[in-house]
Amino acid sequence: MHVKQGSKKLLLAAAVAASSLNAHAGATINFGEDKSVSVGLGMRYSFTSAEDAAPNGKDRSSDFNLDSARLYFGASLNKYIKGMFNTEWDGDQIRVLDAAGQFAISPEFNIWAGRLLSPSDRANMAGAYYSMGGGYWPGVASRYGYNGGIFRGRDDGAVVWGNVADGKLGYSIGAFEGRTFGIGSLTQSQAKNAGVKSTDSLMYAARLQYDFWDAEPGYYGTGNYLGAKDILAIGVAGRYQKKGVLVVGDKGDYASYNVDFLMEKRFKGSGAVAFEAAYYDYDTDDVIESEQGKAYSAGLSYIFEQNVGWGRVQPFLHWQRFNPDTNIDTKQYDAGVNYVIDGYNAQISAMYSNTKVEGTRSLDKFVVAVQLQF
């Protein structure tokens, strides 16, 4: 497709504007034309009171926890060659989160290779730092994501992505190691050690998204724009790996797909309302039926335009359901409020959550969390 130079400049400007919302504050040192290094820090800390989670198994817990601590590093060699290296605290040690070379040929065509998120649903591409609800992660419905991958949903591989049609149509397609779905199956090395023989096939993943209102340029996404944009978007994503599900005594193909929707509308002088919804279908080739089935999620929020003290108030609601082939459903309801001080760089959230697994009684928890990025 031929794109005029003026359109390319507009797309680049839009990409810069978008990255200002879903990027940490950070610090950048320039040492030549299009040459720079950047560094940043992100952290989330929380207090949780959960039903029956005390050591005696019957009282409420009272726990402070460092949920996440990240170091962000970026570098630019020239206009076209860049890289990222990010780390994450996993509760015991610092691990590599992202490590990828980035070749920015044009807004319509980019190549990233290394350890990174593979194409998937909006929730996974946004991650816990950039989702509606301050650290919220839809782990009931989005089964492959924060709990999957080599670490925090990441995998080793390469992806081609871009934004065409004036930035309104985003695409991404890639090949990855896979077999790290977080569903109880064996990884390639674990299967080899257990004597489970299988072909060494790759996992293929792709995503296609169309923005009817404002464009959303870039690869990693945002779950909620906090009133900064008017968004009406629908996305479709899928993954497939031949013999991607390995257990002792059995193996099968892995396949999943999802459809997700986001609508966010600003009302001048008042605020912005947002609604999100997603549908998921997971297929483990009948090897792990507890992770094979359908899932659903939905969310609603409203952010007020006027500040209250330092920041803006954003109440939100979430609902999730996973219906596996074992018919042991899991449902979760969340209600809370965010206090947005500086976009995703400074937020305080309070959330009540209720989770119900079929055949057991429901359990609730209350969480207060602080998120900071520098």
What name fits each language-model region?
Residues M1-G26:
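Cleavable N-terminal export/targeting peptides
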Residues H2-K4, T28, G32, G57-K58, ...:
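Outer-membrane beta-barrel pore domains
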Residues V16-A17, G134-V140, T187-Q188:
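Acidic/polar active-site rim loop that often engages polyanionic ligands
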Residues A27-A54, K58-F181, S198-E216, T222-G227, ...:
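Outer membrane beta-barrel
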Residues A53-D59, I183-A194, L246-G249, V287-I288:
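Solvent-exposed loop segments that connect transmembrane elements
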Residues L186-K192, G218-Y225:
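Low-complexity, polar-biased intrinsically disordered regions enriched in Pro/Ser/Thr/Gly
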Residues G195-T199, G252:
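Interfacial loop-to-helix transition and helix-capping segments at the boundaries
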Residues E216-Y219, G271-V273:
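Short, structured loop/turn "capping" segments at alpha-beta junctions
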